[in-house]
């Protein structure tokens, strides 16, 4: 059974906690489907080409219908002309969204957590909180403290997951390129797969692994 690594306040390993048994044997195809669903939902539908009705010009017939020895043409906006309209081109009216049901979303999340645990990249800490130093009635050095936490983990990049995250903690991590901190309600399988390691508050971890099969 896969286990998450429990860290102490100094981010040193002090134990482990098992993932529920239902996390075992989940098909990886659920994660594949969720990643396709996620990427399609954030895709910017901006590709657009002009058809022959939208390009400028073409108000008159370019040459006489007969007698010139050339193929007949009615307008320079025809797709056969350089600068004419595009046939079957990109349109910004296409809907790229792919549907996925709630059960597949849950299974994808559970599979991604299981993969992180098997790779020893899933960590649990009691609390993720950055307080900084109070100077001139303002909290300062927030990012410095957050960076020290990240460096102590010795990971390439890290996803931090909190429950009821405070503003100081959110600001502290916002300037770090290789870190992302989110509330547990924003957690999804794509983010778990995108980061090489995951650090979760104990309360957030319990919130995620509780049995939701009845929902």
UniProtKB/Swiss-Prot annotation:
Keywords: Ribonucleoprotein, Ribosomal protein, RNA-binding, rRNA-binding. Residues 46-76 are annotated as: Disordered. Gene3D superfamilies: 3.40.1370.10. Residues 56-71 have a biased composition (Gly residues). GO terms for cellular component: ribonucleoprotein complex; ribosome. This is Large ribosomal subunit protein uL4. One of its GO terms (biological process) is translation. InterPro entries: Ribosomal_uL4 (IPR002136), Ribosomal_uL4-like (IPR013005), Ribosomal_uL4_dom_sf (IPR023574). One of the primary rRNA binding proteins, this protein initially binds near the 5'-end of the 23S rRNA. It is important during the early stages of 50S assembly. It makes multiple contacts with different domains of the 23S rRNA in the assembled 50S subunit and ribosome. Forms part of the polypeptide exit tunnel. Pfam families: Ribosomal_L4.
